[in-house]
From Swiss-Prot:
One of its GO terms (cellular component) is nucleus. Interacts with E3 ligase SIAH2. Interacts with LIMD1, WTIP and AJUBA. This is Prolyl hydroxylase EGLN2. Its cofactor is Fe(2+); L-ascorbate. The gene is Egln2. 2-oxoglutarate binds at residue 379. It comes from Mus musculus.
Length: 419
């Protein structure tokens, strides 16, 4: 019998949603993210501090290379922080519940896929209403029945033009209703996949985020920044005796997306903004009203990485970290550069390969200490942090924030709190 303290595999715990944010997702595909893999009773129990419930993935092989291992992390260094707010600080031991249960293992061994939960949103978690249950479906059926009955009872007295007008009118009404109710692709991605993943795991991996064409343009702009000498060594807030390059080995540039030669980076940020905007109001008590500039980072491939750290251990306002990777044909066994996340209170390590067109999202606070393993090839990433309004306002009153943390206002339409 396995020990409950034994590290568990996370390779099935981060299921992937097919398709990219730039393409329209069918309802059946949009639903394939988290729900198809999670046991029904477990999803709402996530993210209650000190909760004893556990969670895992059921049957199915997710389309991701994010895995978990028992790899021992490099020791956490105390008292250092990056200019981007990456702080190295002792971690709290308390956290959310463990990730895997024996019941889930039993289901997986039997090849059983749990039935998708059908719940409304809940304050302590929950899931989105199934997009396949369209609010307009009943009206369409009623309209179809009405049209059919009209054709049977009217006889010769009803003209074909009247029937045609009625059908046309009802069709236009249905089309308008679809347009009003049907969520956009970023909205479906946010509600059906990112929000449940963040509530349940605190980590979300989305492949094929932009698509090969736009992703390739972003990569070209980042490479131009590097070869144009625009990148500078990443800095540390705390200046100690230890050389900064022994803590972090990346070169960075802060980009708004409006600069010449950075339009595609701006388009990337617009896509990420759109997804996060639809998450607003559904991720705990956070009120997301802005973000940092985009931090373009390059590890030059000389064996440097970034030691284990927490992005926001002291409440500087950042609540969500989004990282977009740009590394084509990347092989971590050859090139290194693996990102490892150590979810607080869970006996797992999430290994995230920095693959091209992959978007990684995770909580910025002490729940997700992480590190970048030494990279032996040029490794590119773009990172942005989203602010919680209340914490950010408090941080402004307390601290003089580093220049790289000056926020960019992002218009966020706060959705109505789901019921």
């Amino acid at each position: 019998m396995d020990s409950p303290c034994q590290p568990q595999a996370l390779n099935q715990a981060l299921p992937q949603l097919p398709g990219s944010v730039s393409e329209s997702l069918e309802s059946s595909r949009a639903r394939m993210g988290v729900e198809s893999y999670l046991p029904c009773p477990l999803l709402p129990a996530y993210h209650r501090p000190g909760a004893s419930g556990e969670a895992s993935a059921g049957n199915g092989t997710p389309r991701t290379t994010a895995t978990a291992t028992t790899t021992t992390a490099s020791p956490l260094r105390e008292g250092f922080g990056g200019q981007d707010g990456g702080e190295l600080w002792p971690l709290q031991s308390e956290g959310a519940a463990a990730l895997v249960t024996k019941e889930c293992q039993r289901l997986a061994a039997q090849g059983a896929r749990p039935e998708a939960p059908k719940r409304k949103w809940a304050k302590d978690g929950g899931d989105a209403p199934s997009p396949s249950k369209r609010p307009w479906a009943r009206q369409e059926n009623q309209e179809a029945k009405g049209e059919s009955g009209m054709g049977c009872d009217s006889g010769a007295s009803n003209s074909s033009s009247s029937s045609s007008n009625t059908t046309s009118s009802s069709g236009e009404a249905s089309a308008r209703l679809r347009e009003e109710v049907q969520p956009s692709a970023p909205e479906r991605l946010a509600l059906d996949y990112i929000v449940p993943c963040m509530r349940y795991y605190g980590i979300c991996v989305k492949d094929n985020f932009l698509g090969a064409v736009l992703g390739g343009r972003v990569l070209a702009e980042v490479e131009a920044l590097k070869w144009g000498g625009r990148l500078r060594d990443g800095q540390l807030v705390s200046q100690r005796a230890i050389p900064p390059r022994s803590i972090r080995g990346d070169q960075i540039a802060w980009v708004e997306g409006h600069e010449p030669g950075c339009r595609s980076i701006g388009a990337l940020m617009a896509h990420v903004d759109a997804v996060i905007r639809h998450c607003a109001g559904r991720l705990g008590n956070y009120v997301i009203n802005g973000r940092t500039k985009a931090m373009v980072a390059c590890y030059p491939g000389n064996g440097l990485g970034y030691v284990r750290h927490v992005d926001n251990p002291h409440g500087d306002g950042r609540c969500i970290t989004c990282i977009y990777y740009l590394n084509q044909n990347w092989d971590v066994k050859v090139h290194g550069g693996l990102l490892q996340i150590f979810p607080e209170g869970r006996p797992v390590v999430a290994n995230i390969e920095p693959l091209f067109d992959r978007l990684l999202i995770f909580w910025s606070d002490r729940r997700n200490p992480h590190e970048v393993k030494p990279a032996y090839a040029t490794r590119y990433a773009i990172t942005v942090w989203y602010f919680d309004a209340k914490e950010r306002a408090a941080a402004r009153d307390k601290y003089q924030l580093a220049s790289g943390q000056k926020g960019v206002q992002v218009p966020v339409s706060q959705p109505t709190t789901p019921t």
